[in-house]
Amino acid sequence: MELLRGLGVLFLLHMCGSNRIPESGGDNGVFDIFELIGGARRGPGRRLVKGQDLSSPAFRIENANLIPAVPDDKFQDLLDAVWADKGFIFLASLRQMKKTRGTLLAVERKDNTGQIFSVVSNGKAGTLDLSLSLPGKQQVVSVEEALLATGQWKSITLFVQEDRAQLYIDCDKMESAELDVPIQSIFTRDLASVARLRVAKGDVNDNFQGVLQNVRFVFGTTPEDILRNKGCSSSTNVLLTLDNNVVNGSSPAIRTNYIGHKTKDLQAICGLSCDELSSMVLELKGLRTIVTTLQDSIRKVTEENRELVSELKRPPLCFHNGVQYKNNEEWTVDSCTECHCQNSVTICKKVSCPIMPCSNATVPDGECCPRCWPSDSADDGWSPWSEWTSCSATCGNGIQQRGRSCDSLNNRCEGSSVQTRTCHIQECDKRFKQDGGWSHWSPWSSCSVTCGDGVITRIRLCNSPSPQMNGKPCEGEARETKACKKDACPINGGWGPWSPWDICSVTCGGGVQRRSRLCNNPTPQFGGKDCVGDVTENQVCNKQDCPIDGCLSNPCFAGAKCTSYPDGSWKCGACPPGYSGNGIQCKDVDECKEVPDACFNHNGEHRCKNTDPGYNCLPCPPRFTGSQPFGRGVEHAMANKQVCKPRNPCTDGTHDCNKNAKCNYLGHYSDPMYRCECKPGYAGNGIICGEDTDLDGWPNENLVCVANATYHCKKDNCPNLPNSGQEDYDKDGIGDACDDDDDNDKIPDDRDNCPFHYNPAQYDYDRDDVGDRCDNCPYNHNPDQADTDKNGEGDACAVDIDGDGILNERDNCQYVYNVDQRDTDMDGVGDQCDNCPLEHNPDQLDSDSDLIGDTCDNNQDIDEDGHQNNLDNCPYVPNANQADHDKDGKGDACDHDDDNDGIPDDRDNCRLVPNPDQKDSDGDGRGDACKDDFDHDNVPDIDDICPENFDISETDFRRFQMIPLDPKGTSQNDPNWVVRHQGKELVQTVNCDPGLAVGYDEFNAVDFSGTFFINTERDDDYAGFVFGYQSSSRFYVVMWKQVTQSYWDTNPTRAQGYSGLSVKVVNSTTGPGEHLRNALWHTGNTPGQVRTLWHDPRHIGWKDFTAYRWRLSHRPKTGYIRVVMYEGKKIMADSGPIYDKTYAGGRLGLFVFSQEMVFFSDMKYECRDS
């Protein structure tokens, strides 16, 4: 009892010491998160379970959103501790579900706009991520190979000291990490007023899944002491590296002074006064004497245990029948028993004797088992008779039996093996009640049959004794039967039924017919007899006299049925198929005329040939496939019409495209009918495809393509950076895009004012950052180097910018070639460049960037195709491309004769090219006038991206309209677009305000593809492309964000951009400005501005220096939209079918928002109107 009292005193002293105020100089400071949130045993969102440490509670996280935050005052205490120690030590024991991502700890803003700091265990990547929200960006520091989400208990120790972080898992030291700013910059002193500390709760889908225990912040100690307390013997060596390494010249942040939970009343913590504590110290001195006595007793017990252990270590012995035997010693007890000693255990084994097949066996001296001895006597083979059995009846008459056995293997035996006799013990006393009893069973009877299945029977009598004086009769059956089986009985055969009579041998005059039967009812078996009788039977048939046949003279038409009557008359049936008549006279039917669509009609010709009899269809025309029916009669022709379909090698498998290429069907009029195109991740001519890492359409290695086919078969001169134009100014085999010095003048391109001209002197007279060697206006400042007429003389110094022969000061369209200088509205701006040629508007203001001046822009567009009604050549039929091939002012979409040759479009074999003669030499349905060039633009259909639009033949963004979406303010620069590859590649080089680069080609249905690449690791914002562009307020946009982030300016609306690909429709009531800017940044819907059609649910952001390939399909007629993004050869994101009919087509362009060095390479658009 004294010992227990002393231990209790020690415990109270420890509790008081561990809760002292900072001035008391304690050596430990612990902030247990689960204690701080109130209730360390239970609470919402968590359930108490058994943990790794049995002395402290563990919690299974069921719903982290319900777990309350740490109170503000406690959080403020913790912040003060962080500032005092310039860091912290974070401890946690966890058992995390396998391959999950979960937040251990997070500091989130109270306005729910995001997290400021979080510690996340990323089981999918095998890392521990520290996320810090810094001004203008977010830093994520990942400790690699932190395998925590294994389903097993793990213990982490995270030591953060200013801008350094060191992680320990159990006793293993992981790699260290460096923060962009000291930790005090994140854990500011006023942080508790704007943020709260949460445990296990993270962003969407980032809540912790598993069990947590001992989640604590520790101050006033070192990681070395913590790891040593955990039993990590090597913790000293592990920690010396970080403790002795001064960061940025500062002293170590973790000090030994204690900062714990604040309190004002010491006695409230300890529960004892100082006098009481003093008396406890005196009691402890008495306890010391008791402990010393206890130590002496324990020492004596220890010595006795040692003696007992030494005694047990002696060699084992065995004792048997009073005799001592050594270990492994063997001895014999008698002739049938042997024993041995094994580890102090006596094991004995008896000899097992076999059963002897004789009655005269004896055991020889010294042996254990008996032996049989031979005998020649017939009686010697028998064993002695057994004792008689008890009498079967206890009173009255009964029977007794005895038996003997014969050694038939060694002797011959004669006589019976069983003897039976009657017995009579006493007379039955019939004066008292007696229950009946069964006698012994009789022997089994012989089988009831001699063959097959039968039964055998045995009986017993109720006479042992018999019931008397109303005694109970015997219970049970008096007879017992069981089956017996003999050899199978023979089965005699039996006849089956007769078959029907067969056909008579003649129809008249007496003939014979026959029938038969089988011996199968049953079939003879097991020696049974065969059937008796005949197998077949005959009888006379058709005994009547034969009539006179009038059809023997063939009076009917060949193939018509002839019916003869007994009186010699006859009658003809219908004409055979393919003929018509009365059966006597028949003529051929012209199936081709009677059924005008029996065969394929091509170019107005019914491809059917009549024969006598019948008809046959001609083979399907060239480039068509189908059946070639033939037959007789109108009914056959109507039921078996010929169908010829245009042949499609892409579906019938007759193409020769590479397995890594896609077969694109061009139509049966094209020659060839298909084009092979390598899939994303591959490049080549489609027949041969090779690996293409940067997705710019050029293979990593040279390909052996067909003769003279070098396009996209040569090795990529920049295999890791998209450059679809393969520009190489100095011809050194390294593309300009990845060549640091394109002109070999020893001046790096990023500092060379003429990167493509050798100019080591770098002279720049006009100081426009364009060297004199390559400056198209060397004496006029013009950094943009604009040259409208492409004559080598820049616009800044040209006297005639557009090259129309009219000097600039007298030219009413300085940038547009217009010799006639027509100016209908007399506003000083020529009609060729006037955005309102019929209304006076010298300022040319165009607020919505739709190429229509505000003066004449009414934005009334009933068919939503981007062209207002009074300027739309089909105001009631959507036709965004405004195609009008006969230039009659009526668009092709609503013109029944597009080429004005007098042949309606539905019968014109050249719909866009005048050919009133409709000449078609090869009969393929395509007129000679438009053979292989349907729109007559001198570009073969196989190479024409829009074969039905004369105005569009190739992808070209060399001319584009720059559209700022936030034109006011100077927070960032305007986009800077660099054009390459004849307009098929554009690069945006600066961090800029939101803006578009929109081409001038207009489309209805379109496919748009290209390669997306970010060539920098700076920034993480938006880039993408637009389609269906009609104005700066009306367009579709596909935009991609790398990481989730709130826009820095919350006015006029808060904007939260989530990582991942988005498809949005812009229909802004305000147009470009801060409202549209914030709405574009925001992932979601903003009324009156932007509506999100789809966002990637996996929130996958783009990666730096990684090539992606996009494919857009837009069909305005049905509203179908689909965006697919490839990463290498695999699909990374797929929107699936989206349906939206807001806009019926428009222009294509590119989009950037606060993101630099965006490459749009190998771009390609194709019309899909037909």
From Swiss-Prot:
Residues of the VWFC domain: 316-373
Residues passing through the membrane, by range: none
Cross-referenced Pfam families: Laminin_G_2 (PF02210), TSP_1 (PF00090), TSP_3 (PF02412), TSP_C (PF05735), VWC (PF00093)
GO biological process per UniProt: angiogenesis; apoptotic process; behavioral response to pain; blood vessel morphogenesis; cellular response to nitric oxide; endocardial cushion development; growth plate cartilage development; inflammatory response
Record keywords: Angiogenesis, Apoptosis, Calcium, Cell adhesion, Disulfide bond, EGF-like domain, Endoplasmic reticulum, Extracellular matrix, Glycoprotein, Heparin-binding, Inflammatory response, Repeat, Sarcoplasmic reticulum, Secreted, Signal, Unfolded protein response
Protein family (similarity comment): Belongs to the thrombospondin family.
Protein name: Thrombospondin-1
Organism encoding this protein: Mus musculus
